[in-house]
Amino acid sequence: MTYLAETVTLNNGEKMPLVGLGCWKMPNDVCADQIYEAIKIGYRLFDGAQDYANEKEVGQGVNRAIKEGLVKREDLVVVSKLWNSFHHPDNVPRALERTLSDLQLDYVDIFYIHFPLAFKPVPFDEKYPPGFYTGKEDEAKGHIEEEQVPLLDTWRALEKLVDQGKIKSLGISNFSGALIQDLLRGARIKPVALQIEHHPYLTQERLIKYVKNAGIQVVAYSSFGPVSFLELENKKALNTPTLFEHDTIKSIASKHKVTPQQVLLRWATQNGIAIIPKSSKKERLLDNLRINDALTLTDDELKQISGLNQNIRFNDPWEWLDNEFPTFI
């Protein structure tokens, strides 16, 4: 028996589950099986990206489930993200074709701009996904070379791919309010979603209010805060107390007889924010999927959790190598 998460209707009429499975840091050797098992449990939203280096495996899991009749393609919301190296209008369609080829799908449901940053492109056969790599000389210097491509040029190239039926919906990720405002002034096709780092240490309430008023769905990543970044040896994360052990979170969890993880996820969904937590355990996967049935936080509890905000951002391009990208300044 499968359990299907509550859905939200996006500004273009498409539906998206409020709870999905994040594919970031999902190991290649188990990724296909985890996607397949998640579909059996009831997951329908899969949040991937070119930069996660596992789109082939995501596609294998998806296509196995479709082939076996567990699900129809139109029932799934398969997400990818345009990496920074492919912002030039000539490279946008090539990058999407690479994603579709890796996924072995005819279209993606949501295609985000991963960051509002344009890197100097490198050929697929030199390095893919390229990550921070913009050439051997740059790599030797610990440097990322930028490419001078306005965001609106990238967006218009993406809009053409929507027209061609290769993308159903467009999204933006890691954008500031001012950038979103500027994009909306020139966009023909409105983004359906904004994906941001979001947890009680970084609540971004003003940005979320603006985006919601603009009719754009907010999707949270790294809902557990510093835990997501510990294995990356992120100094800020290593020096920040875990939310799982915070007295406020533990107290609320104890009151509702749930885990601290469930409190953090429900705080997001109860505020209308979609979540994409990752887990390799079937029990936890189902708990995450059924989070809205597990508990309802009081208004006071919601305020207590939001009151933990310290504006701590763990994923900040200002700290990438030597570049100091001003994405969130």
Curated annotation (Swiss-Prot):
Catalytic activity: xylitol + NAD(+) = D-xylose + NADH + H(+); xylitol + NADP(+) = D-xylose + NADPH + H(+)
Coiled-coil intervals, chain numbering: none
Gene that specifies this protein: XYL1
Binding-site residues, NAD(+): 173-174, 222-231, 278-288
Lineage per the UniProt record: Eukaryota, Fungi, Dikarya, Ascomycota, Saccharomycotina
Protein purpose: Reduces D-xylose into xylitol.
Pathway membership: Carbohydrate metabolism; D-xylose degradation
Native organism: Kluyveromyces lactis (strain ATCC 8585 / CBS 2359 / DSM 70799 / NBRC 1267 / NRRL Y-1140 / WM37)
Name of this chain's protein: NAD(P)H-dependent D-xylose reductase
Site (Lowers pKa of active site Tyr): K81
Keywords, comma-separated and alphabetical: Carbohydrate metabolism, NAD, NADP, Oxidoreductase, Xylose metabolism
